[in-house]
Amino acid sequence: MSYANYRYMKARAKRWRPENLDGIQTSDEHLINLFAKILSKHVPEIGKFDPNKDVESYISKLDQHFTEYPSLFPNEHTKRQYTLNHLEELEQQFAERMFSENGSLTWQELLRQTGKVQGSNKGDRLTKTFEGFRNQLDKVQFIRKLMSKANVDDFHTRLFILWMLPYSLRKLKERNYWKSEISEIYDFLEDKRTASYGKTHKRFQPQNKNLGKESLSKKNNTTNSRNLRKTNVSRIEYSSNKFLNHTRKRYEMVLQAELPDFKCSIPCLIDTGAQANIITEETVRAHKLPTRPWSKSVIYGGVYPNKINRKTIKLNISLNGISIKTEFLVVKKFSHPAAISFTTLYDNNIEISSSKHTLSQMNKVSNIVKEPELPDIYKEFKDITAETNTEKLPKPIKGLEFEVELTQENYRLPIRNYPLPPGKMQAMNDEINQGLKSGIIRESKAINACPVMFVPKKEGTLRMVVDYKPLNKYVKPNIYPLPLIEQLLAKIQGSTIFTKLDLKSAYHLIRVRKGDEHKLAFRCPRGVFEYLVMPYGISIAPAHFQYFINTILGEVKESHVVCYMDNILIHSKSESEHVKHVKDVLQKLKNANLIINQAKCEFHQSQVKFIGYHISEKGFTPCQENIDKVLQWKQPKNRKELRQFLGSVNYLRKFIPKTSQLTHPLNNLLKKDVRWKWTPTQTQAIENIKQCLVSPPVLRHFDFSKKILLETDASDVAVGAVLSQKHDDDKYYPVGYYSAKMSKAQLNYSVSDKEMLAIIKSLKHWRHYLESTIEPFKILTDHRNLIGRITNESEPENKRLARWQLFLQDFNFEINYRPGSANHIADALSRIVDETEPIPKDSEDNSINFVNQISITDDFKNQVVTEYTNDTKLLNLLNNEDKRVEENIQLKDGLLINSKDQILLPNDTQLTRTIIKKYHEEGKLIHPGIELLTNIILRRFTWKGIRKQIQEYVQNCHTCQINKSRNHKPYGPLQPIPPSERPWESLSMDFITALPESSGYNALFVVVDRFSKMAILVPCTKSITAEQTARMFDQRVIAYFGNPKEIIADNDHIFTSQTWKDFAHKYNFVMKFSLPYRPQTDGQTERTNQTVEKLLRCVCSTHPNTWVDHISLVQQSYNNAIHSATQMTPFEIVHRYSPALSPLELPSFSDKTDENSQETIQVFQTVKEHLNTNNIKMKKYFDMKIQEIEEFQPGDLVMVKRTKTGFLHKSNKLAPSFAGPFYVLQKSGPNNYELDLPDSIKHMFSSTFHVSHLEKYRHNSELNYATIDESDIGTILHILEHKNREQVLYLNVKYISNLNPSTIMSGWTTLATALQADKAIVNDYIKNNNLNI
């Protein structure tokens, strides 16, 4: 080991921690002892021997080496073996033959007679030493045994693991597994391979040393220093602005890289000095390349120092016609859009042609991948592998032949052939020749035959299949069930070792029942043939094959085997029992003469890919190729492509939170009545889905021995649940998620019934897990009353509850209450609807009839008939029977009834208004909305213009107007405040309250410069006075930055006090107050407060009572972050330099810090331009969310929002949503209005309101003249006037509000309501005005 490499490994060893290696296991005790001996006595580097020197000199040095380390070479056998391992291959074979002929030869005599010796470095010696070891290692036990036997210090232990262990495992089959698990070893091997590449691979050296500067340059590295920015992150060497290795020469060229999946090309730097592929963020955005987080955060430096925390998925790239698949690290800036590293070139066997400035791919003759061998312990089953078997006609197995039963015998299929190009013709001839040779097909005389077609295989070849679609129409279905994926995965619980078997040409292993061959005939240009084995493409083949393989495997399928079609997975809990399990399965396959495809089999693995999932001891996740399929999907161009995309997403839905919510905008496009129009909403939906798949969750295997927790919840429209289990770390991990829509009847359930429904549906969904558990499992619900309903032994309230309680008796559970705020997962799932679950058309429960039927009395009939006489059309129907028959109208009890059993009424009469009022105000439904009220009335009545009349009535209902919130977009565009000319001229101020007490403080005074965005944070108390605030502002702001010109603040009593007014006059600044209840006026301070609160949570969330200690750090962090509005940091704008933020940095000073310098003036001008641009963007974004302003005129009646403005608001959830109505006096600004408030509250509230807090009060005296809620009328002070409407007397009264006793209000009410409130005053008014009541 060279000194430089030793220093590097020493630095690596210091950073290594034992948790990076969980350990190793092996039964080879001799290997453990040997490793321990080497570790106990660390062997230093003895130098590299030149094989061209004389043998005696080498023998002398080797003898000295053996003498210095007797523990490693205790006998002649170990010395001789060490010597043999250091000979060239031919010389080694020669020496071994000599030793077999003469066993008494010493190691010195072997060297002398062999004549040629290969010297090597320490790494090669270690490789040779353990070259004979071929068994797969389990890390955990191996390292534990090694540590216990080796008596050595911690540093040498790490050094051994990092340096010696990878080399000793170099020829092991699972070498890549180690590299992926041990990041230190991976990084080290990458560096070593890169460093030695130029020496060991001559073909990468440029052939022409006089290269053109325009395309290929040759550079010499001038430094060996390594600028590592952090010691706890992955190491990537770099020089200038590129990832470089500093131990060899570097060559560059630029080529156009084609990305066929994204239909684009990008200029790409081919850099043999780079160790990583990189791509810029701009390129990723421009071509919408999918990325994912990268767990190894890397600092790269040079011209563009930054942190890399994302990389692309593996992309298909074409370079000079050479196709490769690789991934890129995403960087902010780089000299080229992308760069391909040396490592990628090496891994893909690509060389640079320096004379032609192109790339070429060498034939990998020496790297041909051999078919994986059957492990030695299973050699007895070698005769069932595809390598020892050619496809031949299998023997029929009684009872398992493939039967084809048809629904009718006399059928004819269309006679046609699909046209085939020459390439497919050759493939067809090859397949038919092979089929005839093996006997699986034969020529046929059948009169019905199906055409052939070709589908591509994974490896790129073509497979001939028959298009049996015409025949499938006449084939009787096979009802044998295919296994459910979820139930298959559940059987794997507790297993730690897996073997996967794949059957070769699985369908062709089953014979067709004699006499059914002609039914499977197919035609092609060569003629008509028929299958003697089960073919691909026929509809009943999958079900029959599942029955076939289940029967073959028999009882083993229930214990340690799961199979889905031709995919067989054997799982065990230990190595010893796994061997037995695998042999059992192989014996079953051998008895049935089945053949396995050895190339696709995997033996004794800790993790495998099976039916689309990555399965391990911990749980299962989707395979990366399925995720990549979604991540690489481009924008769908039509409904077919969109359905294909949603199909891929639906396969992964159990790993995607909020699937239904995310796919909702996409599903809308698939509706029949929706026109295809792709908008940014759909684009964002696809991007959100892709982001969820970047890091999918791991779902744990269900374990019947672990504690079970079921959390359920119900929303208005759906139910949700999460099933979890408690593991060894006392934490609950999810087993699965569930959510489902409610049916139409279930939507009408009470809250308790909906919560009960969530439990019932969840138990049904996971019944195979939860039924008959030995120990009770826990159910958590956020509905306290539900516990009593379930545990109550009294008579059930209804039949539905009785059925549910009977169903619950099959389960052993305990139910507990937990608030909804804690039950957040199930609560969220109940609001995410599984749109794939069918909703039954007819529910077992009858929906509640909400119709408040109006009694059809004789008086009502007479009133209707009277109204008929005033309507010409209805009167004609009443008197003309032929006309009634023509329009399908019946006459019952004097009433006209249409085909929908609706009573026909004249339009817009006193009768219709009475009906609307009855249903809206006096029915069992409380003030229903327009749609609901219309649907209810239409069940019994109809008339012309019914919808319009109902809409007008509801919109003018006083109770609805003041109590129901509005769902429209807010009124009023944003009016940004223009920026000032320089820092600290215009400020904004506010307080952050409700902070935990820290060092005697419980609030924070925030001052923000509106120009630079710099913030000053001063701890204070909630009870601070105006005088204290003025002193604090003087000492912390004015003393450092001078007098401001203006300050914007809210209407806090401190800033409106006389003390503060005197303070403002003293320092000559103007106070401007934000509009009451309109935070957008001072949005800057609001956003600053939010950012400060987030930063405080980051630094003291675990110890919140220490926040005062972190204020200076939070202020520094905020003021040194680039602000989106100015594109600079507040500190840099004010002080004209950037401070040092860590010991590794130096401050960058500007030569011109004078505020009157040309540079400063230019900076201020740039900042102002950025602020103006930002204001325009904010206004554009904000105005997108508002609707056109409703202009109010003086004299209009409006209502004021209570809850958002605080106006006349009490902390009472049942208080009305709006106050009023009030008259508009005038318009006092672009979006502000002054209202005529009662004298009693004018001193309490500002009379000016923003338009977004106002709603127009609709009042139609013909419908309902009352303008105030009768429950709000307290003591009547005075009656102003009266009016008669529809034989009802209305009074305009001034009264004391019940909701706000200190408030005097006025409005219209009925005589009956006024009499209930104050009979004496009302009677006096009637008497004085001579009213005839």
UniProtKB/Swiss-Prot annotation:
**GO BP field:** DNA integration; DNA recombination; proteolysis
Provide an example Pfam family for this protein. Answer: RVT_1
Give the Peptidase A2 domain ranges: 266-342
MF annotations from Gene Ontology: aspartic-type endopeptidase activity; DNA binding; DNA-directed DNA polymerase activity; endonuclease activity; metal ion binding; RNA binding; RNA-directed DNA polymerase activity
Active-site residues, as the UniProt record annotates them: 271
Q: Which UniProt keywords apply?
A: Aspartyl protease, DNA integration, DNA recombination, DNA-binding, DNA-directed DNA polymerase, Endonuclease, Hydrolase, Magnesium, Metal-binding, Multifunctional enzyme, Nuclease, Nucleotidyltransferase, Protease, RNA-binding, RNA-directed DNA polymerase, Transferase, Transposable element
Database matches in SUPFAM superfamilies: Acid proteases, DNA/RNA polymerases, Ribonuclease H-like
Q: How is it modified after translation?
A: Processing of the polyproteins proceeds by an ordered pathway, called maturation. It involves the initial cleavage of a 27 kDa capsid protein (CA) from the N-terminus of the polyprotein, followed by the cleavage of a 56 kDa integrase (IN) from the C-terminus. This leaves a 72 kDa protease-reverse transcriptase fusion protein (PR-RT), which does not seem to be processed further.
Q: Where is the composition biased (Polar residues)?
A: 218-231
Give the binding site residues for Mg(2+) 1.
502, 566-567
Per the record, its GO cellular-component terms are: nucleus
**What are the residue boundaries of the Reverse transcriptase domain, all occurrences included?**
436-615
Chain positions covered by the region annotation Disordered: 199-231
Any idea where the Integrase catalytic domain is? Answer: 979-1138
Give coiled-coil spans as residue ranges: none
Q: Which amino acids does the record list as binding Mg(2+) 2?
A: 990, 1050
| PANTHER family for this protein | PROTEIN CBG26694, PROTEIN NYNRIN-LIKE
Q: Supply any other comment.
A: Retrotransposons are mobile genetic entities that are able to replicate via an RNA intermediate and a reverse transcription step. In contrast to retroviruses, retrotransposons are non-infectious, lack an envelope and remain intracellular. Tf2 retrotransposons belong to the gypsy-like elements (metaviridae).
Name of the protein: Transposon Tf2-7 polyprotein
What organism, scientifically named, is this protein from?
A: Schizosaccharomyces pombe (strain 972 / ATCC 24843) (Fission yeast)
Q: What is the lineage of its organism?
A: Eukaryota, Fungi, Dikarya, Ascomycota, Taphrinomycotina
Recorded name of the encoding gene: Tf2-7
